[in-house]
């Protein structure tokens, strides 16, 4: 399955990549696109749903004719694993900004933590974080946030949480597995989870493990894909001589 998905086909393919920490989704697209061009292979390249720089895991790219199918991948449900630090908040709901509003967590019990997670299951309205790319009055929300502005009336959207499993508790860190609909901000869930427990919290680690039926176990590294592109170009050149 992995070889079929991650082959470098002339008409286009889906590339399943394990995105490294610190890379933007566009960084990955740019690296792949540049490699195609450098090796004399003309390919359109686009990603099938962004992944934050501070997250790792499954990023799907489409090339060639498969770029026409990007929208069919973007709508698929997602699965994540990660960690939340309780007893402290950040403006961005993750580690991108400074911690504030510290609070004791030693009084929290395992049953309270599991029950708080269960309360997130089902359909709900979710506000995007201020530090997000959502548009508001001609600007991205993060642009407003960096100017010190808060937009309480930012528009909520419908999301659904299918599973929110607590997989480990070592306070103040709580580890989890999450299954959600497309467009769900896991950072917002982390922040709201901390609020529900009365201590605050933010996302310290996030890894995307599934997009629909596509799994991180099928993914390859950026280096693996780049190597395949070079080999494909060499084989193509050999056929021409």
From Swiss-Prot:
<dbReference type="Pfam" id="PF01509">
    <property type="entry name" value="TruB_N"/>
</dbReference>
<dbReference type="InterPro" id="IPR014780">
    <property type="entry name" value="tRNA_psdUridine_synth_TruB"/>
</dbReference>
<dbReference type="GO" id="GO:0003723">
    <property type="term" value="F:RNA binding"/>
</dbReference>
<dbReference type="InterPro" id="IPR032819">
    <property type="entry name" value="TruB_C"/>
</dbReference>
<dbReference type="Pfam" id="PF16198">
    <property type="entry name" value="TruB_C_2"/>
</dbReference>
<dbReference type="InterPro" id="IPR002501">
    <property type="entry name" value="PsdUridine_synth_N"/>
</dbReference>
<dbReference type="GO" id="GO:0160148">
    <property type="term" value="F:tRNA pseudouridine(55) synthase activity"/>
</dbReference>
<dbReference type="GO" id="GO:0031119">
    <property type="term" value="P:tRNA pseudouridine synthesis"/>
</dbReference>
<dbReference type="InterPro" id="IPR020103">
    <property type="entry name" value="PsdUridine_synth_cat_dom_sf"/>
</dbReference>
<keyword id="KW-0819">tRNA processing</keyword>
<comment type="similarity">
    <text>Belongs to the pseudouridine synthase TruB family. Type 1 subfamily.</text>
</comment>
<protein>
    <recommendedName>
        <fullName>tRNA pseudouridine synthase B</fullName>
        <ecNumber>5.4.99.25</ecNumber>
    </recommendedName>
</protein>
<dbReference type="GO" id="GO:1990481">
    <property type="term" value="P:mRNA pseudouridine synthesis"/>
</dbReference>
<feature type="active site" description="Nucleophile">
    <location>
        <position position="52"/>
    </location>
</feature>
<comment type="function">
    <text>Responsible for synthesis of pseudouridine from uracil-55 in the psi GC loop of transfer RNAs.</text>
</comment>
<keyword id="KW-0413">Isomerase</keyword>
